Amino acid sequence: MTALYWQTIGEGDRDLVLLHGWGLNAEVWSCMLERLTPHFRLHLVDLPGYGRSQGFAAMSLEQMAEIVLDAAPAQAWWLGWSLGGLVASQIALTQPQRVHGLITVASSPCFAAQDDWPGIRPEVLSGFQHQLSQDFQRTVERFLALQTLGTESARQDARLLKSVVLNQPMPSVEILNGGLEILRTADLRQSLAGLSLPLLRIYGYLDGLVPRKVAGLLDVSWPHSSSIIIAKAAHAPFISQPDEFAEIIGTFVAENGICRQNAQ
């Protein structure tokens, strides 16, 4: 049986869908709940094949976006972290009329490094795919450790991420490989350049997976969007700097919500 895990909580009147990253599940947002629920109606989703959304086969980015969108409210703000940022971006491209605004966190429209583009070396992503079949759990743990590297609370944050994975059903090797394949091959740089809805990109200064150079490059090629780099954060800024992160989200939605209402 395939069923998408979807939990809705919060006292606010604005819908905000939160999409997690590779290998994880919606529990990764636990530290943000008390900060966001007074202001938003939060939609916590386990992406297809991850956490409690079991029974799905590996799929393309477009297929994943379609499945998530089918369960979503008619209109919402969308926030995607890492791989979730690609899914949220694809949703904004597919059905922009259903997206009030898009927030990507430690994400890139093109995760794989290219000659003119900073990112993860393709052979590193391919290596992770190979290692999954050799030592599943250790490979996932290595990837999680990379996400917090360099922060003041790196060990504590890595333990939190590990507990998020272990406390819910584990994704299969097929699902994890499929996610890495999306990270290795997706390139939404040109597609998103034409997006006209509010777009905020949040980065961690210490992020070893999405280099901060990406922020400057997209500032130039996507002038309609804005970016913020959180100084002491790595790949999971909402875990290492939750108060600053929540303030950034609240400000962006408040400012752009007013702009959207005035434009309608």
Curated annotation (Swiss-Prot):
- Pathway(s) where this gene product acts: Cofactor biosynthesis; biotin biosynthesis
Q: What is its main location?
A: cytoplasm
Q: Which SUPFAM superfamilies match?
A: alpha/beta-Hydrolases
What's its catalytic activity? 6-carboxyhexanoyl-[ACP] methyl ester + H2O = 6-carboxyhexanoyl-[ACP] + methanol + H(+)
Kindly list the GO molecular function terms attached to this UniProt entry.
Answer: pimelyl-[acyl-carrier protein] methyl ester esterase activity
Asked if the record carries the keyword Cytoplasm, the reply is yes
Keywords attached to this Swiss-Prot or TrEMBL record, sorted alphabetically, are: Biotin biosynthesis, Cytoplasm, Hydrolase, Serine esterase
GO cellular component terms? cytoplasm
Residues the record marks as active site = 82, 207, 235
**Enzyme Commission number(s) from the entry:** 3.1.1.85
Where is the protein localized? Cytoplasm
Q: Which domain of life is it from?
A: Bacteria
Q: Which InterPro entries match?
A: AB_hydrolase_1 (IPR000073), AB_hydrolase_fold (IPR029058), BioH (IPR010076), Carboxylesterase_BioH (IPR050228)
An example Gene Ontology biological process: biotin biosynthetic process
The segment(s) forming the AB hydrolase-1 domain are 16-240
Binding of substrate, residues: 22, 82-83, 143-147, 235
Chain's role: The physiological role of BioH is to remove the methyl group introduced by BioC when the pimeloyl moiety is complete. It allows to synthesize pimeloyl-ACP via the fatty acid synthetic pathway through the hydrolysis of the ester bonds of pimeloyl-ACP esters.
The UniProt entry's sequence similarity note says:
Belongs to the AB hydrolase superfamily. Carboxylesterase BioH family.
- UniProt subunit comment: Monomer.
Q: What is this protein called?
A: Pimeloyl-[acyl-carrier protein] methyl ester esterase
Gene, per the UniProt record: bioH
